Amino acid sequence: RMNRVLRVLREKSQWDEPLGAGRGRGIAARIYSVSPIAQAVEVSVADNGDFTIDRVVCVLDCGFAVNPLGIEGQVEGGIAFGLGGAAFGNIDIVNGEVQQSNFHDYPVIRMPQMPKVEVHILPSDEPPTGVGEQATAPIAPAVANALFNATGRRVRRFPLSSQGFKLV
């Protein structure tokens, strides 16, 4: 099933099409609850480390899709949550107490930062599986791989803001 997901991702993301200077593409994949998912991310990076996420292509095989629109919403939400964590999610603990208390000191991704997201649900006769958390985990490594592809700089830890990259 993962092989099929990756083949469709290659096609839908136009993986073989070159990107211009300062642009990069990266992928990440995982199996969650027996269901494979893969994501391709395209970024544009300035010399100072400012970057935009231009496009996310997500392909998943979650078995029989009972509610495709609900699945798309879950996947888009998971991607948004994962992007915020990857870009600037940081929790400070002092004397056993979390210092962040709300969105004023724990930033989340904002609408202008959210990329175009394409969700491709593969037709399947397999039993349906969960998709609630499926899209969150692979997005950070896919972005890191895209940044590496664009800049040659490996990301070794998150958030990206701690590595000199700023999502704008």
Regions found by a protein language model. Give the residues of each.
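Cofactor-binding beta-sheet edge motifs in enzyme active sites
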Residues: 1-168
